[in-house]
Amino acid sequence: MTRSLPSATRLDVTGYGYQAEALPPAGEAPRPEDDPRRWFEHPERPFELEIGSGKGTFLIQESPHRPEHNFLGIEWMMAFWRYAADRARRRGMQNVRMLHADAVEFIRQRVVDESIHTFHLYFSDPWPKSRHHRRRVVQDATLQEFHRVIEPGGTLRIVTDHDELWAWYEEHVARCPLFEREPYEPCVSAKPNELVGSNFERKFIPEGRHFRGMTLRRRSPV
């Protein structure tokens, strides 16, 4: 899967790539000093976070359209993380950073309350076997975490091509009162007939796959 990527020895993530294991130990709860917005030159700007960035195509395409926003991509696969961080560095994209981490764990331990403007969850691993369903990003508990860290009126954007995972999303969203479901609008950088414009989407559009998306807007606590 990673054979087409450049050798790691030719990739430079300096200033753009962060690793969770290299960060100071996390506290019992997220602390201001752990806030990843501090990794940007302008930490006060709206902060968007993508879970599962792969090679970084969405971030590389979307961020120039919204230079007033900061974008953090979290990727678990080391080779993809390095490649995406190097892409951002070579382009001098000051509003993009990449993190190698378990996304849910990082959010729970290090993302402070009401700090995320938008979450992006595109083509997440469906983990189709029943015994692996607990590994799916969207769970009852993670929706509560997303609500904690999303700012008032902020959103969680979800896209998938996997029918069973889509049903899983709908089931969990239906019983979660923390978000209001809204129609999904394609990303600014998406081409006609695309929802996101990722490598994955472009690879499988010719096969006629059905892509579906939803937007969840954070409701204020009652």
What are these regions (language model features)?
Residues 1-49, 57-64:
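S-adenosyl-L-methionine
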Residues 119, 146-147, 156, 169:
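Class I S-adenosylmethionine-dependent transferase superfamily signal
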Residues 109-118:
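A short acidic, Gly/Pro-enriched loop at the edge of an enzyme's catalytic core
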Residues 46-105:
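SAM cofactor-binding core of SAM-dependent methyltransferases
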Residues 153-160:
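Conserved beta-strand signature within the Rossmann-like core of class I S-adenosyl-L-methionine
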Residues 117-128:
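Conserved proline-anchored active-site loop of SAM-dependent methyltransferases
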